[in-house]
A protein has these predicted regions:
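Short juxtamembrane and helix-loop transition motifs at transmembrane-helix boundaries
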Residues: 1, 25-31, 91-100, 119-127, ...
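Topogenic membrane-insertion module of multi-pass membrane proteins
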Residues: 1-44, 217, 222, 228
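Interhelical loop and helix-boundary elements at the membrane-water interface
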Residues: 1-14, 50-69, 114-136, 178-193, ...
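Multi-pass membrane catalytic core of lipid/isoprenoid biosynthesis enzymes
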Residues: 7-10, 52-117
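Hydrophobic alpha-helical transmembrane segments of polytopic
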Residues: 9-12, 32-39, 104-111, 137, ...
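Alpha-helical transmembrane segments of polytopic integral membrane proteins
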Residues: 18-21, 38, 76, 110-113, ...
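Helix-coil boundary and interhelical linker segments in multi-pass alpha-helical membrane proteins
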Residues: 19-34, 76-103, 144-161, 208-212
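C-terminal membrane-associated helical module and adjoining short loops/tails
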Residues: 126-236
Length: 236
């Protein structure tokens, strides 16, 4: 019986992702944030439960990836699609493409699937990541969409930034750039400096700017990973 518990938690992740997709189509980005965050919680606890109970299976690994594609790929991409579909400030030269450009959002789940497949086959990513993790990508987009909808007036810069971020984040997910993990093996500051700095910064960003502060936190996470790696190499 206990071997089915982690898979049941994973299916709650998938269910949350499906509801997030439905909420995105209705334009309720606040609900999208809630359901994707719930999916992230379930995504954490399915692995935690598997380790705690001492159970694992190939089915569990595959099911986890399928759930993540929906919750952290399709769900945030649907929110981005709706944002671009209803966008009213396309620059003049992009107006002829305004009915096509929203579909670029679905590059995100495509590259999420590639990233997850790569992760499953890569034994180098046990204590850290190569490329941007899909949950981090999802957190960026759900907070970005939630925050942007309240900006007035919407302008061409938002159009450019959204399309640019789609390309950048898609490539980051399948890149070979080392990204540190938030998993803390020991409750001590030494060895967890980056994680502590990120958590404190994320809290500060959210306190200053609300939910869209999460997007700034993810950008800080990317910068901290990249420049932290560069500093480490220089130091050595």
């Amino acid at each position: 019986m206990k071997k089915h518990i982690p898979n049941a938690i994973t299916m709650m992740n998938l269910f949350s992702g499906c509801v997030a997709v439905a909420m995105a189509f209705s334009g309720n980005f606040g609900a999208v944030v809630v359901w994707v965050l719930m999916a992230a919680v379930f995504d954490f606890f399915d692995g935690f439960a598997a380790r705690l109970l001492g159970v694992s299976s190939k089915m569990g690994v595959e099911l986890d990836s399928l759930a993540d594609v929906v919750s952290f790929g399709v769900a945030p991409a649907t929110a981005v699609f709706i944002l671009l579909r209803d966008f009213s400030a396309y620059p003049d030269f992009l107006l002829p493409l305004s009915t096509i450009l929203p579909y670029t959002a679905f590059l995100l789940p495509v590259f999420s699937a590639l990233r997850l497949a790569k992760f499953n086959l890569d034994d180098r990513q046990t204590s850290s990541f190569l490329g941007l993790p899909t949950p981090a990508d999802a957190l960026f987009w759900i907070s970005y969409c939630y925050g942007v909808q309240y900006l007035s007036p919407l302008n061409e810069k938002i159009c450019y930034s959204t399309l640019g971020f789609i390309v950048i984040f898609s490539l980051l997910m399948v890149s070979e750039i080392p990204m540190f993990s938030l998993k803390i093996k020991k409750i001590q500051f030494a060895g967890n400096e980056k994680q502590a700095l990120l958590v404190v910064s994320m809290i500060a960003f959210v306190a200053l700017w609300g939910i869209i502060g999460v997007a700034w936190g993810i950008l800080f996470y990317i910068a901290l990973s990249i420049f932290g790696n560069s500093f480490g190499k220089t130091k050595r």
